């Protein structure tokens, strides 16, 4: 199968799973997943499945990336916080849609590798930082959108505080060894509103920094 055919099949799979927003599809068409996957799994970059990366983490399956991004309803003026850089793939997608992206990860190795990819791809509106993402990034708050790519038993209150009124947060909620639910949180002047997207399985949101050098 040619590269063009694989990409067409990739986009068809996204649409069939409910990713229909044209801006999101365009971003995912233009950000190649391949460079974010290393080693023997690189040849499976166009398959709709999660794959292992360094530090015991995973790169999410593309359809879930698409659905989470779509649920954020990002405008070109938005400032976005991502908690859980991982491979950097999700942040790269966000960078095509938002004015500015801040992405945090507790593993310094993942942050270093993601920064290298962002530089190589000339994605200049992403700032990647080694930090405990459960505390957010207070010096850049508030954020128009927040995306959390690790599961918490409850949405962290600190992140809720750093979300603008009128903002949207997408986060997987549930225990790491049980069914998790992908939740969309809308922050209004009257409080918080919650919608459930689907069941998912994510690595847990952990406190502290990873011991990976």
From Swiss-Prot:
The active site is at 60. Pfam families: PCMT. It is found in: Cytoplasm. It catalyses: [protein]-L-isoaspartate + S-adenosyl-L-methionine = [protein]-L-isoaspartate alpha-methyl ester + S-adenosyl-L-homocysteine. One of its GO terms (cellular component) is cytoplasm. One of its GO terms (biological process) is methylation. Keywords: Cytoplasm, Methyltransferase, S-adenosyl-L-methionine, Transferase. Its EC number is 2.1.1.77. InterPro entries: PCMT, SAM-dependent_MTases_sf. Gene3D superfamilies: Vaccinia Virus protein VP39. One of its GO terms (molecular function) is protein-L-isoaspartate (D-aspartate) O-methyltransferase activity. The keyword Ribonucleoprotein does not apply. Coiled coil: none annotated. Its main location: cytoplasm. Belongs to the methyltransferase superfamily. L-isoaspartyl/D-aspartyl protein methyltransferase family. Catalyzes the methyl esterification of L-isoaspartyl residues in peptides and proteins that result from spontaneous decomposition of normal L-aspartyl and L-asparaginyl residues. It plays a role in the repair and/or degradation of damaged proteins. This is Protein-L-isoaspartate O-methyltransferase. It comes from Roseobacter denitrificans (strain ATCC 33942 / OCh 114) (Erythrobacter sp. (strain OCh 114)). The lineage of its organism: Bacteria, Pseudomonadati, Pseudomonadota, Alphaproteobacteria, Rhodobacterales. The gene is pcm.
């Amino acid at each position: 199968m040619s590269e063009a055919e694989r990409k067409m099949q990739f986009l068809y799979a996204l649409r069939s799973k409910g990713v229909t927003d044209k801006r999101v599809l365009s971003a995912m068409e233009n950000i190649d997943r391949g460079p974010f996957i290393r080693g023997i799994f690189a040849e499976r970059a166009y398959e709709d499945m999660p794959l292992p990366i360094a530090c015991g983490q995973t790169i999410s399956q593309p359809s879930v990336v698409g659905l989470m991004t779509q649920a954020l309803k990002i405008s070109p003026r938005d400032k976005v916080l991502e908690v859980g850089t991982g491979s950097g793939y999700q942040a790269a997608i966000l960078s095509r849609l938002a004015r500015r992206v801040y992405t945090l990860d507790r593993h310094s190795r993942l942050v270093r590798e993601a920064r290298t990819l962002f530089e190589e791809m000339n994605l200049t509106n992403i700032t990647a930082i080694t930090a405990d993402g459960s505390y957010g990034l207070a010096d850049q708050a508030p954020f128009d959108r927040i995306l959390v790519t690790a599961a918490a038993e409850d949405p962290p209150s600190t992140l809720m505080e750093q979300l603008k009124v009128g903002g949207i947060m997408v986060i997987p909620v549930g225990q790491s060894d049980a069914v998790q639910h992908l939740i969309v949180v809308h922050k209004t002047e009257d409080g918080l509103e919650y919608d459930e997207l689907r069941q998912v399985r994510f690595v847990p949101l952990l406190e502290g920094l990873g011991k990976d050098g």
